Amino acid sequence: MPLRIVFLGSPAFAVAPLERLVADARYQVVGVVTQPDRPAGRGRASVATPVKQAALRLGVPVLTPETLRDPAAVAELAALRPDVGVVAAYGEILRRDVLAIPPLGYVNIHPSLLPLYRGPSPVAGAILNGDAETGVTIMLIDAKMDSGPILAQRTVPLPPDARTGPLTQELFTIGADVLVETLDAYARGAITPQPQDHARATFTKLLTRDDGIIDWTQPAVRIERMTRAYDPWPGATTMWRGAPLKIIAARVIADRCADVPPGTLIDTADGPAVATGNGLLALITVQPAGKRPLPAADWRRGLRLSGGERLGDASARLSGGEAVH
């Protein structure tokens, strides 16, 4: 008989694992649990999560509880009689009563090489640190965050131009491939879960808008990584003439720069560039507040510069916060 699976996930990159499970005859997805519909867009119309939309298309029953702390939601989940749960960025930490429902527990897809980068923003963390490789981990969930035993891992190179959005999608697609083979082997007892080396653990945080504020006293290398690590959220942002300016793409063009204060806008043979605490950062694509992204050279042509104008105010703060993944 097929393995009975309940799938918990919400964002677009969690759709690939769901589709792979539904298409595999070894598995029966008996239900999907996802976040409730939320208002979105300018009209604030109620919008289902990408996982809910996929589940309805695939003909899988869907549960959308406000929280799995609700006893009624826990009872609905238990009524599905799953053998195992699969979690892919569901959006809520599972409590012990939920963890106890499937006999085989819950298998999680985590987009890092655990124990590195536990927590909610592992892809951004790897990019920001300039790692040469990253990967995906298939693991069992326990009561602590991303600390459970490992079933399988897949390592992939981390390209120097990687951005969090596309890389997250790629890792979950790879994770879907690893998952469908690992899950069957785990259910048959052919895999022995391996405990993590907790002494090697590193952690990531829930990102807020403030994390994306550029401090131009930082090295150019780190600021360039910010433009990729914080795409799509929260973005790498600075202030220019009293309004936010998002730096979408940039390139380090010098290890050192002229003797000008960090944040100073400079014209170079490579186009507009900004002095940093260590190096010169050429701007490639920017997005002024309320406008579409445009080449930085076009943005610069529209400016009348007075000498020594500077970008940024590292003490500025923006409101709000949300998770990357």
Curated annotation (Swiss-Prot):
One of its GO terms (cellular component) is cytosol. GO terms for molecular function: methionyl-tRNA formyltransferase activity. It catalyses: L-methionyl-tRNA(fMet) + (6R)-10-formyltetrahydrofolate = N-formyl-L-methionyl-tRNA(fMet) + (6S)-5,6,7,8-tetrahydrofolate + H(+). Keywords: Protein biosynthesis, Transferase. (6S)-5,6,7,8-tetrahydrofolate binds at residues 112-115. InterPro entries: Fmt (IPR005794), Formyl_trans_C (IPR005793), Formyl_trans_C_sf (IPR037022), Formyl_transf_N (IPR002376), Formyl_transf_N_sf (IPR036477), Formyl_transferase-like_C_sf (IPR011034), Met-tRNA-FMT_C (IPR044135), Met-tRNA-FMT_N (IPR041711). Signal peptide: none annotated. CDD domains: FMT_core_Met-tRNA-FMT_N (cd08646), Met_tRNA_FMT_C (cd08704). It comes from the Bacteria. It is an enzyme of class 2 (transferase). Its EC number is 2.1.2.9. The keyword Transferase applies. NCBIfam families: fmt. Belongs to the Fmt family. This is Methionyl-tRNA formyltransferase. The lineage of its organism: Bacteria, Bacillati, Chloroflexota, Chloroflexia, Chloroflexales.
